[in-house]
A protein has these predicted regions:
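Oxyanion-binding/catalytic loops of NTP- or PPi-dependent enzymes
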Residues: 1-297
Length: 297
């Protein structure tokens, strides 16, 4: 929502749909918003917590290692950090002719690796394919098609890459809005949102709604066909894309006789197995001593 505010989406025409494409250094998020009657509503969100600019940097590092006969195992932490920094510079400063030029010293000798634009696009194909999954998921959750999106805005430093901008343009069949520095969009939007909360006259007031980006729930034990208890199951309580703030109630029961303590393991994620989701923390509650299933929380 902060990025959407920074781009002034709340000042657009009613019944307009937007997609915020946020690709940072280590994570990727996509949000679909709709504006109507001065209400900017987040319709759906999706993302990949393990996809970002660092993955593109890794491709350049790997190509440099391959070309100059280096391996991770043969390098010190200082050397690996040095090569990553040089690769990051190469990624951020692609030449006008489309080359990614990484220059660095190997055994005291200055060498370079040149990666043509076409070759880098091919190297990045799997990463770009991973971008499509959250985009499709968010469109499906919002019940809209790509052609029904009126405007696409870019957020996050990695969207500065010509490769990414070209890919987004092809994906939606339109040139994305890059009028604001993607590194500053969220901070700028947060400042405007703060002004709205303070009811500053210079800022148009708009109602903002947001959604829960991941399903929230807890780990539970369930009975198997053999009447045995099996742990590691995830019980959703607040589903992904629920408008927030929100509250839900779910009842749970003790699982064995004379149980006096219950540990609530809170997680976020979409897997039915607790171990595949992200742990947010635990709560320990004391319950009365009783038979299994007699006490509930």
């Amino acid at each position: 929502t902060a990025a959407a505010i920074a781009y002034g989406l709340y000042q657009k025409n009613d019944n307009t749909r937007f997609l915020v494409f946020d690709l940072g250094g280590g994570t990727f998020d996509v949000s679909i918003l709709e504006l109507f009657d001065d209400i900017l509503e987040v319709r759906a969100v999706a993302g990949d917590n393990y996809l970002g600019g660092e993955d593109f940097t890794n491709l350049i590092v790997e190509e440099f290692y391959k070309e100059h006969g280096l391996t991770e195992e043969s390098l010190s932490l200082k050397e690996k950090s040095y090569y990553r920094n040089q690769a990051e510079k190469s990624k951020c400063n692609a030449t006008e002719d489309g080359f990614y030029r990484m220059q660095a010293a190997v055994n005291g000798e200055k060498v370079e690796t040149l990666i043509p634009r076409g070759a880098f696009e091919k190297m990045s194909s799997q990463l770009l394919d991973r971008i499509k999954t959250p985009v499709r998921k968010s469109l499906s959750d919002a019940g809209v098609k790509a052609r029904e999106i009126d405007e696409v805005v870019l957020v996050g430093g990695t969207t500065k890459m010509p490769l990414v901008r070209k890919f987004v343009g092809k994906l939606f069949g339109r040139v994305p809005d890059t009028s604001i520095n993607p590194d500053e969009a969220v901070a700028l939007g947060a400042a405007i949102q703060a002004a709205m909360k303070e009811r500053k006259e210079a800022v148009k007031e708009v109602i903002l709604t947001d959604v829960c980006p991941f399903t929230l729930g807890t780990e539970v034990s369930v009975k198997t066909e053999n009447d045995h208890l099996e742990g590691n199951h995830f019980c959703p309580i607040i589903e992904r894309n629920t408008v927030i703030p929100a509250s839900r109630t779910q009842h749970f029961f003790t699982v064995y006789d004379h149980q006096t303590q219950v540990e609530i393991h809170i997680l976020q994620g979409e897997s039915r197995f607790a171990s595949n989701n992200v742990s947010l923390g635990t709560l320990k509650l004391t319950v009365p001593d009783n038979e299994a299933g007699k006490e509930q929380i």
